Amino acid sequence: MVDFAFELRKVQDTGKIVMGAKKSIHLAKVGGAKLIIVARNARPDIKEDIYYYAKLSGIPVYEFEGTSVELGTLLGRPHTVSALAVIDPGESKILALAGGKE
């Protein structure tokens, strides 16, 4: 079993992520991400756009079980994070969460 919090911190340290719903939706549209993570309580229109464009681009989406506040806290941010895109997983195994290709 992959520990989400551990792997998220690992990808933040060794890989490349982009935080924010607008940037994640943009990367879903252009196919520039390997995985998109969305908070459980993200606005419905944001989730709908992310799932729609990610499906078109073949990008896996992982729905984080916690809230956007908890996701922000895991990332060490003092604000909410509704969505983030993993561009480079680095040394983490975070792509295994959503069945993405490593």
From Swiss-Prot:
Record-level GO cellular component terms: cytosolic large ribosomal subunit
InterPro entries cross-referenced by the UniProt entry: Ribosomal_eL30, Ribosomal_eL30-like, Ribosomal_eL30-like_sf, Ribosomal_eL30_CS, Ribosomal_eL8/eL30/eS12/Gad45
Keyword terms, alphabetized: Ribonucleoprotein, Ribosomal protein
SUPFAM superfamilies from the UniProt entry: L30e-like
Pfam families in the record: Ribosomal_L7Ae
A Gene Ontology molecular function term of the record: RNA binding
Domain of life: Archaea
Amino-acid biosynthesis keyword on record: no
Alphabetical GO biological process terms: translation
Protein family membership: Belongs to the eukaryotic ribosomal protein eL30 family.
NCBIfam families: PRK01018.1 (NF002172)
Alphabetized PANTHER family for the sequence: RIBOSOMAL PROTEIN L30 (PTHR11449)
Quaternary structure and interacting proteins, as annotated: Part of the 50S ribosomal subunit.
Protein name per UniProt: Large ribosomal subunit protein eL30
